[in-house]
Amino acid sequence: MFLQINRTSELARVFGIDFFSVLSRGSQYRVESMLLRLAHTQNYLAISPGSQQVASQPAMECQPLVMEPESGFYADPVVVLDFQSLYPSMIIAYNLCFSTCLGKVAPSKANTLGVSSFSPDPSVLKRVKNEILLTPNGVMYVSSKVRKGIMPRLLEEILSTRIMVKQALKRLFPSQKILHRIFNARQLALKLIANVTYGYTAAGFSGRMPCAELADSIVQCGRSTLEKAISFVNAHDKWKAKVIYGDTDSLFVLLKGRTVKESFQIGNEIASAITAMNPNPATLKMEKVSHPCFILTKKRYVGYSYESPEQSEPVFDAKGIETVRRDTCGAVSKTLENSLRLFFEHQNISELKAYLQRQWTRILSGRVSLQDFVFAKEVRLGTYCTRSSSSLPPAAIVATKAMRADPRAEPRYAERIPYVVIHGEPGACLIDMVVDPLELLAMDSPFRLNDLYYINKQIIPALQRVFGLVGADLNRWFIELPRPIREAFAKRPFSAPNAQRTRIDYYCLSKHCTLG
């Protein structure tokens, strides 16, 4: 609790807003607090558009570059390079701001700029024609020699201050824990405000002062910078490198036949060369080397990563797959991570097949922990566009069942509700097979964990998306697996406290045939 108060206090000091507003207000309020204070010192006043003006401004047209990756398994090192604070760097480097924008080269018929009417003065354009920067989306800006923009000035101060705070953080002694927490919260606040400044210009729905042309200029300058970097790396004969994936501000560069140490050396050379190509402060940083790794699709990859050439033991690094996602159960994430580690270390399909068949045998035999098979998904009752309970998500169905038994069991908004999938009647839908884990654990429970659902619908699809890239057919492996004999259920005592013996199926040990 004290740490949260300390962090919030530092955020309030940096943003220049009150304590409660840090918790209750959004990022636009924070940006505007700092932006307007600086604008007033330069004799600027901000416009205050109405909702109709915001809704009627032109739509944004530019998107960041996200390449379609070359999906596959890479046994050779893949260098990951990242532009530090790409969008703030573009704002500073090209002096992009509300106060420096001269409008489009080919103005629209409505003569608008963002949310307001604007027509550039021909005499002004003629006077500063040698100091005009034309961005890739066709919008003109004056250079910093003519006028230094408010946003570039703000971001320069934020980034330089953050560097000083981080340097001071490194000089602290281990015993200075309170100062360490204060400085860390302060540099985090500066990082947050720098990263959301672009979003302030691009908030086209509920924006306080959006400008589509300015937002497009920032995105398009960043996209152009990344495209030039990709072309430069692919065309350089010395490195013999190939960019296999690019995402907004990062590059994945394949170096065939190189060691991890050589990859770090080449990666640093690439970073230095591309940094020298771009205006200050745009900086490409060598982030890590992945060796080996899988690249699945956009924003989904996994591998063993090294952050320095001296690092001996790699770190398991995953993004976008089931090992780091919260919408699956522990059995899926653990099986996938263990399978990946096994394959990365031995790169042997036969060993992987043997491991997975052992895991499937354990699941079919019931020798598993129920905790690994519990889903926990968010429930937002009152937001589902359906009148029938049969169309609700499984977690919402479990929540409504609990509410029928006890109205006080209504979940909070976006609360995660646990549930498991059990065996049902032949042809039963998923919504008829979800129950609270406590119902499955009850002494007189007739339910049994639906092992085939977890294997066929959860584990195999997650693993097939990854290992299908190396030719593995997990469905065939499962079909080839001899089915184990499940141990018989313990006999239910007839002296159980449950007196509701109104149906014959109460006396059955299970609704599922153990011979089937």
Where do the PLM segments sit?
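Conserved glycine-bearing catalytic or ligand-binding loops at nucleotide- and phosphate-handling centers
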Residues: 9
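DNA-dependent DNA polymerase catalytic subunits
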Residues: 13-122, 126-136, 146, 154, ...
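Flexible hinge/switch segments at interdomain interfaces of large molecular machines
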Residues: 134, 197-208, 245
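Catalytic P-loop NTP-binding/switch module of NTPases
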Residues: 141-150
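Non-transmembrane amphipathic alpha-helical segments
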Residues: 155-172, 190
